[in-house]
Amino acid sequence: MTQVFQGRSFLAEKDFTRAELEYLIDFSAHLKDLKKRGVPHHYLEGKNIALLFEKTSTRTRAAFTTAAIDLGAHPEYLGANDIQLGKKESTEDTAKVLGRMFDGIEF
């Protein structure tokens, strides 16, 4: 079964079918196995990912950065001091602009 996730956000499990969730879990296990065996892969080669954090989070930031690099992506960390969410710029406007600039956004 071919899964189409492009253009979709993972906000809640209820937004996905059981088959889609099982696919995501199986694919995650596949990626973990490749990493464990030292098999290189670049599923996200050439993709740019914005990592937006409202609060500092060492483990979460490190996990997302490492995962993005392992997959061949280029992560860009944008912390609370780097962006003006809801201050000088509306959150909606910021999301639209970043959505055009990046292939994926972690928030």
UniProtKB/Swiss-Prot annotation:
State one molecular function term (GO).
amino acid binding
The alphabetized UniProt keywords are: Arginine metabolism, Cytoplasm, Transferase
Q: Does the keyword Transferase apply?
A: yes
A Gene Ontology cellular component where this protein is annotated is:
cytoplasm
Q: From the UniProt record, list the reaction(s) this protein catalyses.
A: carbamoyl phosphate + L-ornithine = L-citrulline + phosphate + H(+)
Q: Which residues bind carbamoyl phosphate?
A: S57, T58, R59, T60, R61, Q84
Cysteine disulfide partners in this protein: none
The EC number(s) attached to this protein equal 2.1.3.3
Any one Pfam family here would be OTCace_N
Q: Which InterPro entries match?
A: Asp/Orn_carbamoyltranf_P-bd, Asp/Orn_carbamoylTrfase, Asp/Orn_carbamoylTrfase_sf, Orn/put_carbamltrans
Kindly list the biological process annotations in GO that this record carries.
arginine biosynthetic process via ornithine; arginine catabolic process to ornithine; citrulline biosynthetic process
User: In which broad location class does this protein mainly occur, judging by the first location in its UniProt entry?
Assistant: cytoplasm
Query: Matching SUPFAM superfamilies, A to Z?
Result: Aspartate/ornithine carbamoyltransferase (SSF53671)
Location in the cell reads: Cytoplasm
Q: What pathway does the UniProt record associate with this protein?
A: Amino-acid degradation; L-arginine degradation via ADI pathway; carbamoyl phosphate from L-arginine: step 2/2
Q: Where is this site: Important for structural integrity?
A: K32
What family is reported?
A: Belongs to the aspartate/ornithine carbamoyltransferase superfamily. OTCase family.
| Protein's name in the database | Ornithine carbamoyltransferase, catabolic
